[in-house]
UniProtKB/Swiss-Prot annotation:
The gene is zpld1. This is Zona pellucida-like domain-containing protein 1. It comes from Xenopus laevis. It comes from the Eukaryota. Disulfide bonds join 44-155, 79-104, 235-296, 255-313. Keywords: Cytoplasmic vesicle, Disulfide bond, Extracellular matrix, Membrane, Secreted, Signal, Transmembrane, Transmembrane helix. Glycoprotein which is a component of the gelatinous extracellular matrix in the cupulae of the vestibular organ.
């Protein structure tokens, strides 16, 4: 009889457990417990934050999916989750859209702290933190035999990114950045145009661009909600596609700006715009064409706080770019590097600059301006000396003729 009673009790327990989990994808041995911290998983994205809660432990605690809501908003259906029974264990999924995160009273706190950017340069860094909680409602009675459930979540967003464009012939590049403090994926574009209206994208001819050609550049962020703006912190150029190249020329860094660079918009929208004139690197002096690669360190700042991060400049002299040519990146971890081809410039040398003279030894040398000036001086001096010699000789002959007339023999006929 005892084995029969044991089998009967086991069957009753199995039926009660099955009834408790209501046929959801749960395991009685693993999930017959109250919720723990490991029962919530948070995914932080640029457009949405997703939370997955173990639904089996919620059922064991005596609640259903309709009892869980964001930040105590139990009367708002938009702040509730939905069940996914295609996973093990079954989960309740909550999704927060960052563009409307205040609708369920989620909290956004942006802190600005001193720090260094990817190149070791002192800069103000912004950190965005979005937080909230998921809970069950309080019972209407004075006491309750059910535990109250509370799940907390938080996502931190580092807002500084390195975007560089190293194949500017294609006039655009896009990158995706994944940061360690949560998953923050953003698309940044560096676009080049040949007009101030930013309507015609730049096409670089195979022969290269003439020197001093004006290029209009724009750094733009997409897939972001309206609370974020783009703030260009540091833009510079290198002769190679390596943003860590020891040789670099700064276009602008804070208030220090190249005289040929003009900033039109920065920190006021999701696009930063500036222009600069094409130049060549001296290291390419023996080449008919020079390559220039553009790189920018870009911040994302909250639209209300961008003006605090934008420097106030009052006729400051630009620092010499050579001072920073020996800087090396502090760290490139967590920053994305994109390559999109070089700006090609031509030297536009004149025939006078290319004129050469043949040497008997089949060697060639080039007449520079100093040698030309010396030769001209010698020719002028020789011509002047010859003129003085001819004048002196003429005067001497005239004097000799006059002397012969005065000292001549007296003609007896005149007697």
């Amino acid at each position: 009889m005892e084995p029969i009673w044991l089998l009967l009790l086991l069957a009753i327990f199995t039926v009660s457990v099955s009834a408790q989990f209501n046929g959801y994808n749960c395991d009685a041995n693993q999930h017959s417990r109250f919720p723990a911290e490991r029962d919530i998983t948070v995914y932080c994205g640029v457009q949405t934050i997703t939370m997955k809660i173990n639904f089996c432990t919620v059922l064991f605690s005596g609640y259903s999916e309709s009892d869980l809501s964001l930040n105590g908003k139990h009367g708002d259906a938009h702040c509730r989750g939905f069940i996914n029974n295609n996973t093990f264990p079954a989960v309740v999924i909550f999704t927060i859209n960052l563009s409307t995160l205040e609708s369920c009273e989620n909290s956004l706190v942006v802190s600005t702290v001193p720090g260094v950017n990817a190149y070791g340069i002192a800069s103000m860094v912004q950190i965005g933190n979005i937080s909230g909680y998921i809970d069950t409602p309080d019972p209407p009675t004075i006491i309750s035999y059910l535990p109250g459930l509370l799940y907390k979540f938080s996502c931190s967003y580092p807002l500084e990114y390195l975007v560089n464009n190293t194949q500017l012939a294609s006039s655009s590049a896009a990158i995706s950045v994944r940061e360690g403090n949560g998953t923050f994926i953003s698309t940044l574009n560096l676009l080049l145009y040949n007009d101030s209206t930013y309507s015609q994208q730049l096409l670089i001819p195979s022969a290269g661009l003439p020197l001093k050609t004006k290029i209009y550049a724009a750094v733009r962020a997409t897939n972001l909600d309206g609370r974020w703006n783009v703030l260009m912190d540091y833009c510079y150029t290198t002769p190679s596609g390596n943003p860590s190249d020891d040789i670099r020329y700064d276009l602008f860094l804070s208030c220090d700006k190249d005289p040929q660079t003009t900033i039109f918009e920065n920190g006021k929208s999701q696009m930063g715009r500036f222009s600069f004139e094409v130049f060549r690197f001296v290291k390419h002096k023996n080449q008919k064409m020079s390559t220039v690669f553009l790189h920018c360190i870009t911040k994302l700042c909250r639209s209300d706080d961008c003006h605090y991060l934008t420097p106030t400049c009052h006729n400051r002299d630009r620092r010499d770019a050579v001072i920073r040519t020996t800087l090396t990146p502090y760290s490139l971890s967590g920053n994305a590097v994109v390559s999109a081809g070089p700006i090609i410039t031509r030297s536009d040398e004149t025939p006078a600059n290319n004129s050469q003279l043949a040497h008997p030894g089949n060697q060639q040398f080039q007449i520079n301006s100093v040698t030309s000036a010396l030769i001209s001086g010698v020719v002028i001096l020789g011509a002047t000396s010859l003129s003085f010699f001819i004048i002196a000789l003429t005067l001497l002959n005239r004097k000799k003729q006059n002397s012969l007339v005065l000292c001549g023999i007296r003609n007896p006929v005149f007697n």
